[in-house]
């Protein structure tokens, strides 16, 4: 897309910069943080305001009703991505039109709900907000519908005008309301809006409905019934092209010209001179542009004027000729002094078949990326944007989808939808996902597990480790050691696993028992992640064997922990003390060699450097434990020698 050639809108930040302070800012994923600095434009620096202002462009993402739009359009988007490239073109076109209509039905449903809320809202500002959102969705649906007609359906001459008539009827539906009011009144022909309704129906090409209302007048005015019958005949015989019929465009054109000549003859013969309203209708049927333009209050928009003008002057308009009529209709309707609104410029670009200008102007005018992202994606699938690449490597479709998905990532629940959008951005989607997924707030373990599944399914190993480390540290801060250990193992972080294992052992030293046994008993091969974790797992296994009265296995495991030197030195005395109950069993558990090894460990422990900060009471306790162990080891050694000597004999 080209560089922005219009001035961006100004956003006022309340109370910021009042004291002529410089403003600092920081970009976030979906918003901008603005704050006052200590520096003034003039004079010495001083303390600024402590407030940080959050400036957000896309406010719609916070609306509960519009979230339904985002959720439902996500399903349509995913269905569109499944359409196979090799499907027949005719089948694909039908599918694309159906998908486009699905998008529009979602917009309409959302718009209706917003309108209901605007009516029932007690708060005036909230009602105004709903009204603004309805206006935006109306414009979006209007543009989308026109793009559907011109680009997706690509209606040819003849059919094109029929589609444009349906487009105008859909977006100028107040005629139906006024028609009901007229018909339901006591005297429809005397209703102030009677002729306005008839004229409006004719301008929309709804001739049968116009005839129905005109018949009310004809039945009351017997003296001029022939005049009304003549108008009824003109309305009834007006040719309408039927794309499904056998009639060619040339045949239709000949038939239409004959009908047009008949209208002109009626006007020249002053057939309707007795009724100014019928004469005006005849001039409209004849395509008198000045008379049609006089009804601008009934049409209210230049594009309604365009379609009505084409209906009565050029019903077989070809797509390439549309832009001329569109430009001249807008100029005639708005006048030389009026400035077109952004919506007018966008619609004019569509009539000029300038797709990229439509997308560019919509990106500037609308307050979120939803519309341009989904419309561009659909148009790209229709192969209408293949020639347009951006200077920075991505194509237009991917750029807009990336922007939309990035906005979704700022919402507490919609971020999950964003993942699917990024999955379908082949060039930069993976990079964006890796950056954005780490910014998702991990409020709960359930949410963290959702994020992890997304990362694991996509082999994003770095993000998996990062998330697991965050959760492990959070659990550790909250003293949830079992959860912390599980997360550190999933992160494959040896240093963190060692730290948590230390906390487990410290907790055991203080309480005399282990917590989170379900985690410790099911470590499996994961205990090999670090030496300290291995020790923790094996030490817990020792306690389990001891509890199951498997004393011999427990003794071997305890001794292997001592000899392998993987136990922290601070726990040696604890391990040796754990051997005391085994040494005092009636049955000899430790062999002579094993007893010597335990003695060696005890002496090595006592020969080490003493902690100068160790209190006297602690020294006495250590000495008592040492004496008890020496006695128990000596007694066990004697018993083991006797037993082994007896066996040898």
Curated annotation (Swiss-Prot):
Its main location: nucleus. Signal peptide: none annotated. It is found in: Nucleus, Nuclear pore complex; Nucleus membrane. The keyword Repeat does not apply. Disulfide bonds: none annotated. GO terms for molecular function: structural constituent of nuclear pore. The keyword Magnesium does not apply. InterPro entries: Nucleoporin_Nup85. GO terms for biological process: mRNA export from nucleus; nephron development; positive regulation of DNA-templated transcription; protein import into nucleus. Pfam families: Nucleopor_Nup85. One of its GO terms (cellular component) is nuclear pore outer ring. Keywords: Membrane, mRNA transport, Nuclear pore complex, Nucleus, Protein transport, Translocation, Transport. Belongs to the nucleoporin Nup85 family. Component of the nuclear pore complex (NPC). Component of the nuclear pore complex (NPC) that seems to be required for NPC assembly and maintenance. Involved in nephrogenesis. This is Nuclear pore complex protein Nup85. It comes from Danio rerio (Zebrafish).
